[in-house]
Amino acid sequence: MLTSLGVKQGHHALDFGCGEGRYTVPLSQVVGKEGCVYSVERNEEAILAAKERLSLFSDPDVVRLLKSDDIEAAGLIPKKSIDAIFAFDVLQYIPDSDKLFLYFRSLLKPNGMVCIYPAAIPHPGDVDIKLIITKMKKIGLQYVKSTEYKMMHSADMVDDIVHSFKRIAG
């Protein structure tokens, strides 16, 4: 799935809301030693689980696990340095998606991708993908496609949709 979404060896990726690192591990394997994966999470228990999983399956020089509370203010991820951002099953927990999307755009290289998986399983605070497409377009992130994949959701595999956006000029 990750390569079909455009991730390549040597890329720099952001796994925003990485949880226990279920997508961070395969991302790190795709980008390889020449690449980098920033994994961002705010939940301490999930961070500990991600550290354990990453120690078993990922090169520690490839993955940078960051706590999300102060990431933008600290400037931990360089602007215009990211090829692909993944926000999988996390947007329902974000109170200000406008601010988050602007931050994502600031991190993306030209033609960089944002991939969103809103999760079909009901959560508090549903995600309106039509509204997201409108918001992304307003800030210069062009809708590319919606593709169905087998997605990891907690301990389950579900058929669901990933929506892709590309940074356009500016």
Regions found by a protein language model. Give the residues of each.
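Conserved alpha-helix/loop element of class I SAM-dependent methyltransferases that forms part
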Residues: 1-11
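Conserved SAM/SAH-binding beta-strand->alpha-helix loop
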Residues: 43
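Conserved SAM-binding loop
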Residues: 50-51
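A short acidic, Gly/Pro-enriched loop at the edge of an enzyme's catalytic core
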Residues: 75-85
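A short SAM/SAH-binding and catalytic strip from SAM-dependent methyltransferases
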Residues: 83-96
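A short glycine-rich, Lys/Arg-flanked "PGG" loop and its adjoining helix->strand segment in the class I
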Residues: 98-110
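Conserved beta-strand signature within the Rossmann-like core of class I S-adenosyl-L-methionine
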Residues: 111-119
